[in-house]
């Protein structure tokens, strides 16, 4: 409530009120600025989020080329795999799965584990963008009609409307699912829990199968995604290549000292 002196003019009252609002607004901005600075100071590794400004514009640009000619990805196995709409559940869980592992490592994991996960993800995703740019690809596997009508087929229809059948090689759903499971399995807390590790494995396999049973990917896309993930796993976790230079630099500094 605004209290005022009867002797004051309305304009003076309004000016004082506006001044209070301005000071309050500046205080809020200052507090928000302090909170942001504190956040980035505590989580210095948050700079990796900038990758979104590379990936998303590039990906949406590729999706905008869906009407251009592309190489059709197809193998004989694709024709033998039936359409099963129930796989929409694990397929959609992929988004939460990959994000949940990311957030866990960001807030609770070691920086090394977080960087390993990001290197795994971002390297494969960048290669996917490059391949899709120089080798436009897609498939013709989607059914034109569904034998059944239920909530799952409705969800699949919505998925088909939102996602074009292009830019599919290698499968990022497959690649990122494997990356998430490997990161979770290597986490000293989550990886020691058999229930969590086992559930993660089942979800990973379900997502991989979903890409084919929903006719979102050819078996060739899946094979390429698995191969790329296997190579990245060897590079990131087996040889620890991503941090070998860091160890060498640290050893050199200790030698100099």
PLM region spans:
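Short, intrinsically disordered terminal tails adjacent to the first/last structured region
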Residues: 2, 8-31, 247-257
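N-terminal transmembrane-helix/juxtamembrane module of multi-pass inner/ER membrane proteins
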Residues: 21-99, 147, 156, 255-257
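Aromatic-anchored segments of alpha-helical transmembrane domains
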Residues: 56-58, 125-131, 202-212
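Membrane-interface loops
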Residues: 63-77, 107-191, 195, 243-257
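Active-site His/Glu-centered metal-binding helix of metallohydrolases
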Residues: 93, 175, 219, 223
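Hydrophobic, membrane-inserted alpha-helices
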Residues: 97-102, 179-182, 203-210
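Interfacial helix-loop-helix junctions of multi-pass membrane proteins
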Residues: 146, 165-168, 206-232
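C-terminal membrane module of polytopic membrane proteins
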Residues: 218, 224-257
């Amino acid at each position: 409530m605004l209290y005022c002196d009867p002797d004051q003019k309305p304009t003076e009252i309004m000016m004082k009120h506006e001044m209070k609002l301005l000071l309050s607004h500046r205080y809020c901005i200052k507090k928000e600025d302090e909170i942001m600075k504190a956040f980035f100071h505590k989580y210095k590794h948050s700079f990796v989020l900038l990758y979104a400004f590379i990936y998303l514009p590039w990906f949406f640009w590729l999706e905008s080329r869906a009407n251009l000619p592309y190489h059709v990805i197809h193998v004989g196995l694709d024709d033998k795999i039936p359409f099963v709409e129930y796989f929409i559940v694990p397929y959609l869980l992929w988004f939460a799965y990959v994000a949940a592992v990311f957030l866990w490592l960001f807030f609770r994991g070691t920086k090394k584990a977080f960087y390993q996960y990001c290197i795994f993800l971002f390297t494969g995703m960048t290669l996917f963008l490059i391949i899709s740019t120089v080798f436009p690809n897609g498939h013709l596997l989607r059914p034109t009609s569904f034998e059944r009508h239920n909530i799952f087929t409705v969800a699949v229809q919505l998925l088909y409307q939102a996602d074009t059948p292009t830019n599919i090689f290698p499968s990022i759903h497959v690649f990122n699912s494997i990356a998430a499971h490997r990161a979770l399995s290597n986490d000293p807390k989550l990886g020691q829990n058999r229930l969590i590790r086992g559930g993660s494995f089942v979800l990973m396999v379900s997502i991989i199968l979903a890409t084919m049973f929903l006719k979102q990917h050819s078996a060739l896309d899946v094979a390429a995604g698995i191969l790329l993930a296997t190579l990245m796993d060897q590079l990131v976790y087996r040889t620890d290549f991503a941090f070998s230079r860091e160890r060498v630099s640290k050893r050199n500094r200790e030698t100099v000292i």
